[in-house]
Amino acid sequence: ALPEDSTFPLLVPRGFADRMAKGDPHDPLLRQVWPERSESVMQADELSDPVGDLSARKAPGLLQKYHGRALVVATGACAVHCRYCFRRHYPYADDTAAAAGWRGAVELIRADHSIHEVILSGGDPLSLADHKLAELTDALSDIPHVRRLRIHSRLPIVLPERVDAGLLAWLRGLPWPVALVVHAN
């Protein structure tokens, strides 16, 4: 049975679930998404923000941990709740670039000439519609010191149909070298 008090409930696309071995509680695909009761108990050595995102926040939806690059939390939406997600406690409702209309994040990137690489992350940025992705990257394309784009996504693995003609056309039309970092197990 699923834990009743899960703040990070089971969420998995049907196509990904269809690839799981039915009746096998040890199936590796199932283990990636199945909530365990122990997850709701914070251990003494655990952190709710294990990668320091909140201390790296520069504006709503903009994180900067390293010189030369900035991470845009493009959305809090994701097609799957992976049990190992290090942003499960991230305050997406209050702190995404989309919630702020991109403007603040884009303007801070524009003002910081040391930023040459922008990372789109989230949630999962490919959860956004193509026109929303284009809206964000169009705003970023006006910044001459941005020279590279990275997109971090799990959707090509759990929802491969998201990689469609529209998404590929958007990717081909981007003015920078693009690295699509696919989160796979």
What is the meaning of each model-derived region?
Residues 1-65:
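Flexible, acidic/Gly-rich N-terminal and inter-domain linker regions that tether
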Residues 34, 42-46, 50-73, 83-177:
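Conserved Radical SAM active-site core
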Residues 77-81:
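Short pre-active-site segment immediately N-terminal to redox-active cysteine/selenocysteine motifs
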Residues 179-181:
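Long hydrophobic alpha-helical segments typical of transmembrane helices together
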Residues 183-185:
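Catalytic beta/alpha-barrel core
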